[in-house]
Curated annotation (Swiss-Prot):
UniProt feature, compositional bias: Gly residues: 365-374, 454-466, 479-494, 882-892, 993-1004, 1027-1043, 1116-1127, 1385-1407, 1454-1474, 1652-1665
Biased composition (Polar residues): 227-240
Disulfide bonds: none
Residue stretches of biased makeup (Basic residues): 21-31, 316-326, 1408-1420, 1444-1453
Name of protein: Probable nuclear antigen
Biased composition (Low complexity): 113-131, 190-201, 495-506, 893-907
Amino acid sequence: MNLFRPLSHRLSLPSTTTTRDHHHQQHHHHPPPPPSRTHFTTITTSGRWLQRQFPVLTTTVFFSLFLSFPPHPPRPPQDHHRPTPARDHRDPRDHLPPTRTRRDHQHRPPPTTTTTTIKDPQHPQDPLLLPTKTLQEEDPHLLRPTRDPPSAKTHHHQDPPGGGPPSTSSHHHHQDPPGGGPPSPPPRPSTSSSSSHQGPPSTRPPPPQRPPPRWPPPSPQKISETRAGSENTAQTLFSHSENKLFSHPMGEGGEGDRGTAGGGEGDRDDPPPPSPPPRPPPPLPPPPPPPPPPQPPPAGGSARRRRRGGGPPGRGGRRRGGKRRRAEGTEAAAADAEEEEDGDGDEDEDEDRAEGEGREDGGEGPRGAGGGAGESESESGRAEGAPRSAEQQVGVAGVLGLLVVRDGLHLDGPERAAGPAVAAADADDLHRVPVLAGAGPGARGPRGPVGLHGAPGGGADAGLEGGKVPEHGRRGARGGDGARGQHQRGGLGVGLQQRRGAEGAQLGRQALGAAELGEAPAAAGDEDGPQRGAEPPAVGRAVPEGGARVKVRVPEPERGALAGHVLAAVHGGEHALAVGARRQRDRGPGPGAGAHRVAHVVLAAEAQRLGPGVQAGEGGLHAGEAGRAHDGARVQHGRAELAAPGPAHGALGGRVQADADVDVVVPHGRAVRGPVLDGVQHDEPAPRRAEPRAEVLHGAGEAEVPRREQQHPLGVEAADVGAPGPVPGPGVRVRRAEAVGEGGEQRREAAAARVPGRARGALGGLGAELLVGQRVVEHHHAHVLGVGYLPHPGGAAAERGAAARGDVRQGGRVEGERRAPEFGEDLLVHEGAGHLGRAVGGEGRLGGPRRVGLAGRDAAEAAVGRGVLGHGPERAPEPVVLGGGGGGGQQRGSGVRSGPESEGAALAPGPPVLFVVAVAVAVPAEGRAGEPLVLLAVPGAAGPGRAALLLAPLGRWVRAGGGGAGVAGGAGEAGLGAGAGLGAGAGLGAGGAGGPGAGEAGGGARRRRRRRWDDEAGLLGPERGQAGRGLRGPGPRGGLGEPGRGHVGRGEEGRGVGPGGLAGAGPVHAVAHQRRHGAGDEGDRVRGLPPLGRAGPGDRVAEREQRGRHLLEAGGPEGGRGAGGRGQPERAGQQALEDAAAGQDAGVRQLAGHAAGLRGGEGGADAGAEGLDGRLPGAGVRGAARVGHVGVGPAEALQDEGLLGAIVAAAHGHGAHRVRQGPERVLGGHGVPDVRQRRGHAAGDEGAVAVGRVDPALAELVEALVGGLHPRVLQPGHGLAGGPAVDEAHEGLVLLPRVPHLRDEDGHGPGRGAVAGRGLADVVLVPEPLAGVPGAAVADAAVGRRVGAGPGLPERGEQRPVGRRGPVGHEREVVVGGAALPARGPGGLRGRGRGGRGGGGGGGGRGPRGRGGRRRRRWRPGAGEWGAGPDSFVFFSLGGGRGRGGRGGRGGRGRGGGRAPRGGGGGPGGGGRAGRGEVRVAAAAAGAAEAAAAAEGALSGAAPAGLSLRGRPAVPGEAESVLVLLGAAGDGLDGDGGGGVGVGVGVGGDGAPGAKRPRIEPPRGGGLVEQGLAVLVMVTTAVPSGGGGAAAAGRRDRPGGGGGWGSGPPPCRRCGHRCWLCWWRRGPRPRRRPGLTDRVPPRGGPSPRGCRGAGRAGGGGRGGCGGGRAPGAAGGPGLCRCECCRGRRPGPGAGPGPGPEDEVTVLGALMESPTGGPGGRGPGLVLLLVFVV
C-alpha cells in the first residue's frame, strides 16, 4: 500500500516509503507488462522468495528511483500517471500532477465505471469497454468504498481482468493508498500513477497502458501479471500462492478471478497457478478487456492491492492492507508485515518484485521517467522524463547498480539491472530468471514457454506463450518487458496486446509508453515509450528501441471480443503465429527470448505490416490506425499530442481508450499478418539463429541497428528509432544500447540514462547499457555483464544481431553457440559488456571489441550480484555467465579474454598492487547523481581477486571484473561468482563482489563453484556462499553458494587458503611480499601479475599455468575456456566454472603466489586462488589485475602519490581520465587498452602509479561515480568534496585528487575535482599523512589513526569524532584504533561483528546466520590470526559495528559478530560495538598495539616505513591494511541499527578486529550515506584472509555487514545483502520508526526499511536489508526486500555485486570484497571506498 503513497514520496523521495513506493512505482511505471510478464513470472515463482528477492530489486530499483526520482519526483509519477487529461496521459512527465488529475478523473468516471466496474471485474468484455475500463479505473476510487470493500478484493482479484479498471483503480489507488492513499488518497493515487490510470481513465486507459508512465498501473498490471502471471506460474503458486492464492482467493473469493483481477493477466495467470495450462476464459476475458490494458497496471495494482487486501485505492489501501493480510493469510502475514511497512508489504514487494522484475527492474522507471514502462523506462532509466533527472539522481544509484552514477540511468540501470538481474537471478534461481518476464512456472521452468513477455503466467498460462503472451505477453511484451520487454518499448505489444492484450497493450503500450516515457517524455512518444524513445518521438509508439510502436487496432466489435477472444486469441489463438513463433523462439534462445521476441516481433511485424505509418503514425498513431490517432500511440508517444489525445485516450470514451490500450490488437483469432508472422517466425527463429534481421533489430548493441526486432521489422531506422531527441539517443544509443535482446529496454535505458553520454556516455553508456532495464537486467546481465543468458530476444536477438551484423566476436558466440547465455553474454559482452566493457573497460571506451566487457561485465555482473549467475546459471543452465561468457568463458573471452584482450588481461598481468576502483556510491538524498565520491583503491594489489572484489561491483565497469568479470566472473559469472577471481578471488564473486557473483555467478558459478569452491575453497563461498545458499538459497545454486560462501568461501578457501595463505600469502600479501621482496618493483607494483616481479606475463603465465591450470586459460582470454567454454555454454560454463574453480584455485593460488611474487608461495597462491579465484589469475589477475591495474600502481607510485593518489590517478588517469579526458595524461596518452603502457605511463611516467590501468569501465565508473556522485558530496566545503572545506573538515583527509594527474587532468587543483573534472579527486580523501604513503601505509595509517585525528590513534573503541565538520559529519571519525582492533582481537572483531563478514563474516557474514556464526567463529580463529593470515586483511569495514549480527552468516559478518541475528555482535548495533563512527583497524598480525603503532606510525608519517596493519613493516604498495577514510563517521548509521557507516576494520578472517572494525559512522542515522560522506575505504590486501575485510565485514552483509560498514545496512537477513538503500533509508527511518526493522517478523524482513524480504529484519537489521537470512538473503527464494535489492534476488545481495544491485551493494561488495571479497579469498584487495551519500 505504501507503495503508492510513497509513490509521491518516491517521486519526491521524501520517505522510505517513497523509496519503496518509488520502487513500486518503478514497477508500476516500469513497463510492467513485459517485465510483469517476465518479472511476474520470475517473481511469481516464489512469491515470498521473490518478495525477498524483489525487495532487493525493489530496493535497488527504489534506490535507483529514489536516487533518480528525487530530482523529478513528480515526473516519474507524472510519467506513470500522465493523468493530465489535457496532456497525453501517456506522458508520464505530466502525470504526477496529472496523476492527481487522473485521480480526479477516476473520481469523475467512477460513476459510469462503477456500474461497469463492478460488473466488469467479472466481465472481461465489459472491462474491455474502454469506458468501463476507464470508469473502472476511476471507479476504484469512487467504487472503492462500494465495490472495493465487497468486491474490490474480489474485483481486484477478479475485477482486474474483467474489471481491469477497477482493479486498476483499486490497485493503483490501492497502491496509492498504501503509500499515500490513506494519508492522501487523492494526491496519492495521482502520484501513484495508479490514479493516473484510474484517475485519468477518463482520459484514457492509456494510464493502464501508460502503466509505464504511471508505474503503479504497470505495477498493478505487473503485479497483476505477477499476481496473475506469477500466480499462474509456479511463482504464482509459490509466491502468489502465498500472496494471491492465499490472500486473494480468500480475500478475493477465488484465485481464478483473482487472477482476473490481475487485469485479466492475473486471471489468466491465476489459473496457471492452479494449473498453468488453465488459461481459462475467465482469465482471458478479463485480461483482454481494454480496461485490463489499463488494468494491467491496475491488475498489478490489483494484485498489489489484492495483496493489500484489495482495499479501495484511496482509502482501502491500508485497510485493504489489513484485509489483504487477512486474505493473504500466509503471504499477508509476512508480506503484510512488510507491506505494512511498505504499504504494499510483501505483496507489494512481491508484486513489485514480480512486477519488479520488470517494474522493479525497470523500477527505476518511476524515478527514471517516473513512468515509462517500469522496465522499459527504468531501463532507459526512463531518463527521458524523470530519468533525465534520474541521470542526475542516479549518480549514487549508478554506482550502486552500475556504479554509474553519472546517468540517471545508472542508478536506475544498475539498480534495475541488479533488480531485474537480481529478480531475474532470483527468478532464475527460481528457474527462470533468464527472462524476467518469461518466468511463469511454465515459462519459468523452461523459461521458454513463458516467453519473456509471456511473463509470469507465460508458461503456465496459455501454453506459456499463447495466451500468456497475448494477455500478459502482449501486455508484457508491450507493457512490461515481457516479450522483448526490453524492447517492449519498440512496438512490443503490437499484435500481442490485443484486448487482454489490449490491457497488455495498454499496459504494454502505456506502460511501455510510460517506460518509454521515461525516455519518451523526452521523446515525444511517451505512450509509445515502450519503444524506447519513440521512433520519432512523435510516432505514437515510438519505437525508439528499434521497435516500432505498432499499434494494431482491433475492430471495435472485436474490442469486446478482444476481451474474451483477443485475450484468448492472444493467449490461445489470435496470435497463434506470434505465440507459436514466440514459443518457438522461446524454445530457441530461451523462453524469455521467445516470448520477448514474439511479442515484440509480432508487434514489430505488425508494425511493419502496418508500415511506418503505424509505427510512426501520426502522433504516434500508426498509419494503420489513423482512426485511432487519439490512440495511445499518438497520445502516448506523441507527448506533444498528449493533451489532446490524452483526453481522447482516456476521456475519448472507453472505446478509444481501449483502442489506445490495445496496442496491436489484431482482430482476435486472426494471426498477426505476415509481418508479425514473418517477424515472429523469422524474427523468432532468427533470433535464435542469429539471423541478420535480429541483428538489425537488435542492433547488436551497437548503434548499428536498434536491436529491436520490431524496430527493424518496422523498418525503423536507427535514426528513426533513437533519433528522436526526446529519447536522447534512443535511436543510436538505443540502438546500441539495445544491444542484444534487450534493445528496447536497454537502449531505452542506455538512451535515457546515457542520453548525456549516450554514445556510451562515459558512464551513461556504461550505466545505461549496463543497466538497461529489467530485461536489460537480464539482458543486461547477459549483455552488459555478459553473464546472463539472454533468454529474451536478447539472446536470440543478440545472436541474430551478431550474425546479421557479422559481429565476429558475437559471431563466435553466436555461431553455433546459440547458448543464449553464452551467446547472449558474448553478444552481451559486446553489447552489454560492450556497453559496459566497451564503455567501461572493455575496449576502450565504448568502442572496440566488447569482449572485454564480457569479463568485466561478468565480474561486474557477478560482483553486482546480478542475477547474472542467478541469471545466467539459472537463466541458462549453461552458466554462460558462470563459466562461460563471463569470466572463464568470459564469453567471447570477453571476461578473461577481456583481460587478455589486452585491455583487461594485459592490464592485470600481475597481482595488482593497488586496485583503484572509483566507485561512487553516492546515494545523494537529493537524488542528483553527483560525482562519484567513491574511489576504490586497493593498494596492496590484493590479488586481482581482491581488486576484482573491489571491482566486482565495478566489475562490469572495470573490466577488472573482466578480469573483473573475468576476475570476478573469472569463470564468467562463475568467474565472478566462482572463479571470478573477482567473485571468488576477490570474494567478489565468491563473496564480496562474489556476493553478486555468487548470487549471480554464485548461482551458476555457485552451483558449480559451490561444489567446486566448496571444495576449492568456495571462492564463491564467501560472498556467495551464503548468497549461494542464501541467495541461490534453496536452489541448486543455493546449495552451492552456501558452502562456497559460508564455508568455502570465506572460511575455507579464504581462510582455507589459510589465514596466512590468503591473508598472509594472499594476493595482497603476495603482492606485498612480492613487493616487499622485490618480486618486481614495477610489475609487482601495479601491473597485476605481469608486472609481478617484472616477470612478464610470460612468467606470470607460466607460473600461473603451472600453478593454476587455468590461470591463463581460465583467467586468460579463454579464461572462459574452462569457465565459459566458448562453445559450450552450459557444459563449458560448468566446466569452466569447475576449471575456473580448479584453475582459479590453482590459478588464483598461483596468482596469489605468483602474482604475489609467489611470495605467498603456496600460501600466496592459495590466498591468491582464494582471493583471485583461479580465473582471477588469468582473467582474474588479468582482469583483476586489469581491474587491479586500475587501482594497482607501483608501490612506489603509491608511495609517491599516496594510495589515493594512485587510486585517483589510476581511476582518473586510467578510467576516469581516459573515459573522461582520455587516459592520455594519466594512462600515457591512450586508451585503456595499453595496460602496460598505461601502467608504465601512469605509474611510471605520470606517477599516476596505482594505475596500472584503469579499465575504461572502471575509469568510467570512477568518472561516472565521481561525476555522478551527489554534488553535495563533492562540493567543496562539503567536507567530502575536495576543496578546502574537505581538507579542513577532514584535517587529515587529503583528497587524493591532489594527485597531479587528477589535478592536472581535471584542471582542478590538487584537492579539487581533479579527477576527470568530476571531482573524483574531491572524492578521494586520504589522510594527509597518508597522502604520500604507500597504500599499505595509508591503509595502516587510516586504520591506525583517525583520519582526521592526527597521528595519535584514538583509544581503541574510542571513535573520537575529530569534529564532524562539514557534511561529512565525523570527518575523522574513522578512528582506526589499530591497537583497539587488535585489542579486540579476533574476538573484538567478532564483537564488531566483523565476524560477520569479517568474522563470521567471511562466510559467516555471508553464510547463513548459523553458518555465518560458525564461519565467524571460524574466522574468529582467523581473526585470532590477524597476525597470521586473516589478520593480514585488516580492513575497514565501514560500519564495522553495526553488528551485522543479524545474519549470522551474513549477519555474522557483521554486527558484532553478528552471530546472533543482528544482535550477534551487539545486536543491530552489535557492530556498533565498535563504536559508531569509530574506525579502527585491527592490526592483523601485529595485534592491536602493534597495528595501532604501525597504523599510527604510518599515519603519523611513518607510513612508508610504518608497519602495515599487520604490524609488520608496511611495504609500500602492500595493501595489507585497510585504509578507510570515511568522510564522515557519525553515529548516523549506528543510530539506526548499528550505526552509521562505520568503518569497521576487520582484521583477520574473523575480522577479529571486527568488533573493533573501525567503523566510521556518519553522525546521522543515515550514516555516511545519509551524510553524503565519502567513505574511502581502502581495504588493502590486508584483508587477504577472505574472512575479514570489508567484504567480510560488510560486503556480504551489504554495506555495513558486520560492521563491514558498521552502520552499513546489516545484511539483509533474507538476502544478506546489505542494502545501503535500505540501510540508508532505514537509517533515518529506523530512527523514525525504530521498531520497524526489529519488529518485522523474520520472514517479513525489515519492512519498508530493511530488506523487505529480509527474512528477519536482521535484528532489525539496520534497516536495509537487515534481515535477510543469509541464504534467503542472498537469495534464494525470497526476494531480498532490501530497498536496494528489493525485487531483486538478494542473491546479489548477497549480491555483493553492487552493480545493479545497488550502490549499497556496490559499497557492500566493495566493502565486502576487500575483506571477503573473495569470500575471504581475495585478501589482497584493498578497497578505497569512498561512500558518499
